[in-house]
C-alpha cells in the first residue's frame, strides 16, 4: 500500500518516548500508589462505629487523593456511611472494607459537604442503589462553574484515579432542616451547620453514643483549608458544636478525637487568629505581605500542612476582612 505525505521510518528512542510518556506516567502512578499508598483500613472508635483516615497531605496521584476521612455505622438493619472519599477507587475499597466488617447492607450515605476529596467516590454508592442524602445548598455547587473546573483540573492532576469516567453525583434526598431517622435502633440526627466551611455543611450526630461526624468543620491536629469560606460563620458554627453533648468527634481530616472541646477549640482559635491579624491589617490599610510577615504564627507553624495552607488561608481572610472593613 502506498502512503502519501508520509515516509515510514524506524522509530528511534526520541520518536517513541513522547508517545509512551503519558502511558508510562499513568502506569508508574498506579504501581507507586499500589505499593506505597495508605490503605483504606477501618478503625472501630466505638462499638459499631468505624472510620477510615486519610493522609495529612494535599491530594496527589501517589496518595490517590486519600486525604479525607469517612465513617460508617453498623446497625442491626444496615449500614450508614458518612462521606464517600476522594475517588471511585477509594470508594470501592471502602465498600469492600465495610463488607469485611459486617454482612449488613449499606442503606444510606450522608454527604457532609460537596468538596472533591469527600465526593468523588459518590458514583460507586449511587451505582449500588444506596440512598444519598445531603444539604440542599449542595445543588448550587453541583451546578456551578467551579465544580466543573475543579473536576477538569482533578482529571489532569490526579490521573489515573480521577478520569473521564469520574462524575459529579447529586443526592437522592436534599435536606434543609434538622432531620432525624432511626436505623436498627440507632438514632441519626442530620444537623445543618452552614454556611461555614461551605454553604452546605451538614454534621451527623449520634446522640445516644455521644458521637459527632463533623466533616470539615473540624480539622484535627492540622491547619484547616479555609478557601473561600466565611470564617466568621465557621466560628459561630464551632461555638454551636461546643454546646453539643458529645464525647467523640470524627473530623473531616485527622484522627478521631476523644477530646472534643479541645479539638473544636483548636480549629476555632486558628480561625479567630486569622481574622484578628488579617482584620487589623485590613482596617489599617496595611499591605498583606507586611501583615503576614509580622504576624505571629508560632502556635500553628508546627502543624501539618501549615506551609501548604496557611499563607493562602491568611490571604483569603485578608480579602474577606478588607471587604467588611468600615
Regions found by a protein language model. Give the residues of each.
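Metallo-beta-lactamase
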Residues: 40-45, 139-193, 199, 207-208, ...
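N-terminal signal peptide c-region/cleavage motif recognized by signal peptidases
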Residues: 32-37
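Active-site neighborhood of phospho(di)ester-bond hydrolases with catalytic His/Asp-centered motifs
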Residues: 82-84, 107-115, 133-136, 193, ...
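Divalent-metal (often Zn2+) His-rich catalytic cores of metallo-beta-lactamase-fold enzymes
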Residues: 233-286, 290
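Active-site metal-binding motif and surrounding structural segment of the metallo-beta-lactamase
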Residues: 76-80, 88-134, 244
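C-terminal regulatory/interaction regions
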Residues: 283-326
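Conserved beta-strand hairpin/beta-sheet module of binuclear metal-dependent hydrolase folds
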Residues: 47-98, 202-214
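Bacterial N-terminal signal peptides that target proteins for export
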Residues: 4-27
Amino acid at each position: 500500500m502506498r502512503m502519501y505525505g508520509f515516509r515510514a521510518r524506524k522509530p528511534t528512542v526520541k520518536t517513541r518516548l513522547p508517545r509512551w510518556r503519558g502511558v508510562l506516567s499513568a502506569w508508574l502512578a498506579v504501581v507507586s500508589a499500589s505499593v506505597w499508598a495508605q490503605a483504606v483500613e477501618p478503625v472501630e472508635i466505638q462499638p459499631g462505629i468505624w472510620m477510615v483516615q486519610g493522609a495529612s497531605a494535599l491530594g496527589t496521584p501517589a496518595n490517590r487523593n486519600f486525604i479525607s476521612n469517612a465513617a460508617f455505622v453498623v446497625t442491626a438493619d444496615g449500614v450508614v456511611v458518612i462521606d464517600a472519599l476522594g475517588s471511585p477507587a477509594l470508594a470501592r475499597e471502602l465498600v469492600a472494607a465495610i463488607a469485611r466488617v459486617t454482612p449488613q447492607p449499606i442503606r444510606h450515605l450522608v454527604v457532609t459537604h460537596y468538596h472533591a476529596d469527600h465526593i468523588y467516590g459518590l458514583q460507586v454508592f449511587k451505582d449500588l442503589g444506596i440512598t444519598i442524602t445531603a444539604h440542599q445548598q449542595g445543588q448550587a455547587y453541583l451546578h456551578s462553574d467551579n465544580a466543573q473546573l475543579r473536576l477538569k483540573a482533578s482529571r489532569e492532576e490526579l490521573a489515573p484515579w480521577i478520569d473521564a469516567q469520574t462524575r459529579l453525583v447529586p443526592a437522592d434526598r436534599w435536606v434543609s432542616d434538622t432531620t432525624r431517622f432511626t436505623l436498627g435502633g440507632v438514632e441519626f440526627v442530620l444537623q445543618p451547620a452552614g454556611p461555614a466551611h461551605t454553604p452546605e455543611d451538614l454534621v451527623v450526630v449520634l446522640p445516644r453514643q455521644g458521637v459527632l461526624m463533623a466533616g470539615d468543620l473540624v480539622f484535627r491536629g492540622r491547619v484547616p483549608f479555609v478557601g473561600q469560606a466565611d470564617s466568621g460563620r465557621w466560628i459561630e458554627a464551632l461555638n454551636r458544636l461546643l454546646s453539643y453533648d458529645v464525647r467523640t468527634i470524627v473530623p473531616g481530616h485527622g484522627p478521631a478525637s476523644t477530646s472534643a472541646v479541645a479539638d473544636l477549640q483548636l480549629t476555632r482559635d486558628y480561625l479567630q487568629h486569622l481574622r484578628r491579624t488579617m482584620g487589623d491589617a485590613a482596617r489599617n490599610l496595611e499591605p498583606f505581605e507586611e501583615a503576614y510577615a509580622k504576624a505571629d504564627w508560632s502556635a500553628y507553624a508546627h502543624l501539618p500542612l501549615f506551609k501548604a495552607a496557611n499563607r493562602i488561608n491568611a490571604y483569603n481572610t485578608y480579602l474577606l476582612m478588607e471587604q467588611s472593613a468600615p
